[in-house]
Design a protein with these regions (language model features):
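A generic, well-ordered mixed alpha/beta core segment in the N-terminal half of proteins
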Residues: 86-112, 116-122, 128
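Conserved beta-strand hairpin/beta-sheet module of binuclear metal-dependent hydrolase folds
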Residues: 4-66
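Conserved small/polar residues in nucleotide/adenosyl-binding loops
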Residues: 134-140
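Active-site metal-binding motif and surrounding structural segment of the metallo-beta-lactamase
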Residues: 44, 55-102
Length: 141
């Protein structure tokens, strides 16, 4: 059963909770479990921000499909490669094979190591390079 939550007009939480774990990273107590946070962004194009741990994989995929409501998935934004964020990448690529990956320069070689494919999904990846920010000073009344 899908379990999604609207965060804002165009953003839907599609993650899932895992109550099996007693400790995060086998170190920090988590008496109420852990949530694997992932979001679908709906606009002219659609994007999925992160995936989830394989332990909640079926629920996660069901949530993403429900949030998309029949629309195709255009982008998968891979934040980083820890399994609790990246374990479902291959399943997402299988289910929505026409999507485009958005990754950083360090993530792309890791994807190729962890998810050996014919390379087509990775060859078309949009690699985000350095980002510069302008510091703004806001007036205080």
């Amino acid at each position: 059963m899908q379990s999604i939550q609207t965060v804002s007009e165009n953003t839907i939480y599609v993650g899932a909770s895992d109550r099996r774990l007693a400790k995060f990273e086998n170190l920090f107590p988590i008496p109420r479990g852990v949530s694997y946070n992932a979001y679908v962004i709906l606009d002219e194009k659609t994007a999925l921000l992160d995936t989830a741990d394989a332990s909640v994989g079926a629920q996660f995929l069901e949530n993403v499909a429900a949030a998309l409501d029949g629309r195709k998935l255009d982008y998968l934004i891979v934040d980083h490669m820890e399994p609790d964020h990246a374990a479902m990448i291959e399943a997402v690529l299988v289910r929505w094979p026409d999507l485009r990956l958005v990754v950083n320069a360090k993530t792309l070689p890791m994807l190729k190591m962890y998810f050996p494919t014919d390379g087509a999904a990775f060859d078309d990846a949009l690699v985000v390079k350095a980002v510069s920010y302008t510091h703004l000073t806001l007036p205080t009344n």
